[in-house]
Amino acid sequence: TGAVTIPATALVTGVLTTTAAAVFNGGFTSNGTAATFASSTSDSPNIIFKNTTNDANAPIMDFITDKGAAGADNDSLGLIRFTGDNDAQEQTTFARVLATVADASNGAEGGRIQLQVATHDGEMQTGLVINDGSAEDEIDVNIGNGTASVTTVAGNLAVVTDLDVDGTTNLDVVDIDGAV
């Protein structure tokens, strides 16, 4: 019982178990390939990043890919998977967030983030892509996957430049020049 201070490196070759909350004052590094947080309690486990500094900055979660060689277009930078049981109690990935390098060219670096969901056969398809554009400070966004995809806008759609429609357009109420 009581506090234990280890003035140097502590080597644990088996499982380290604590019966209370473990507090690390300082950095914590794990050289393992996976860390698992498991709980049989509803709405748990939780991972909390809490910044208690009185300033305008938020906590940061970094996904860093440093492969020891030059980066290349389409390098994967980070993946968040959302997996659960289907009705046969099989573990199925239902959604993913994937970040990749769109352009690795020095001085023209550009990124890409994709939101993906499982479609009717469980196959992962990209529904939203936010991608580096073809000019500085330009971002392109693609919504949907395939010509049968439906994009619904519940409120107003504001187009601040040209509207380019490739296909059939059905307009129920048209007021372009002030007349209906």
Each PLM stretch: what is its role?
Residues 1-73, 88, 101-102, 107, ...:
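Intrinsic low-complexity, repeat-rich intrinsically disordered segments enriched
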Residues 73-81:
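Short, hydrophobic/aromatic-rich segments at coil-to-beta transitions
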Residues 89-96:
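Amphipathic hydrophobic-ligand
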